[in-house]
Amino acid sequence: MRQIILASASPRRKELLKQLIGDNFLVYASSYEESPCPGMHPKELLLKHSAEKARDVAKHFNSGLVISADTSVFFNGELLGKPKSSEEAEKMLKLLSGQRFLVITGLTVLDLDSGKEISELKSTTVWMDKISNEQISAYVRTGEPLDKAGAFAVQGKGAAFVEKIEGDFFNVVGLPLFRLGKILQKAGVSIFEEGLS
């Protein structure tokens, strides 16, 4: 079994990876600090952040596969990451209310043994119901939106606002499991091997 390292402190990504391959992986959070890159297309920026997180963590290991991801909401040509305050969360939710938008994840798998790096973008379309200002305020008070891209959690109370999803549901949570499973299997990881779960 190859060593797998998840380059993320996200409890949601940890749970998703566990769902796919069981407990046989390490979690090593990246210290890479995301910064704006003027002139870079938002989608390219997600790929850059994902790859840089993987490379940062890779410096601490000699062998194995490093998995990293960066997820944001893409609406009107802009990326909506995690809100920095309750006010920003409310603003994001008002913007997305009644709209169709994309949730995009930059996914990177870095093979430390071969040096091969795979970085891809995965997109999922989300339709959000119209949300009243009262609902938005009540939801923000729960604290749930404050560490979520686009200020909502489809796997939490935010599901009450999501009318429809087209594409990989797990991508909206933060890790596109279908595509990741394919990449891991190509790298020699048997996700169906006995003893992995």
Curated annotation (Swiss-Prot):
Site feature location: Important for substrate specificity: 12, 71, 155
InterPro entries, per database record: ITPase-like_fam (IPR029001), Maf-like (IPR003697)
Annotated GO CC locations: cytoplasm
Keyword Hydrolase carried by entry: yes
Reactions listed under catalytic activity: dTTP + H2O = dTMP + diphosphate + H(+); UTP + H2O = UMP + diphosphate + H(+)
Gene Ontology process terms (BP): nucleotide metabolic process
Record-annotated active site: 70 (proton acceptor)
GO molecular function terms attached to this record: dTTP diphosphatase activity; UTP diphosphatase activity
Compartmental location: Cytoplasm
EC number of this enzyme: 3.6.1.9
Swiss-Prot/TrEMBL keywords: Cytoplasm, Hydrolase, Nucleotide metabolism
Cofactor(s) listed: a divalent metal cation
Family statement: Belongs to the Maf family. YhdE subfamily.
Listed NCBIfam families: maf, PRK14365.1
PANTHER family in UniProt: BIFUNCTIONAL DTTP/UTP PYROPHOSPHATASE/METHYLTRANSFERASE PROTEIN-RELATED, BIFUNCTIONAL DTTP_UTP PYROPHOSPHATASE_METHYLTRANSFERASE PROTEIN-RELATED
Function: Nucleoside triphosphate pyrophosphatase that hydrolyzes dTTP and UTP. May have a dual role in cell division arrest and in preventing the incorporation of modified nucleotides into cellular nucleic acids.
UniProt name for this protein: dTTP/UTP pyrophosphatase
Organism: Methanosarcina barkeri (strain Fusaro / DSM 804)
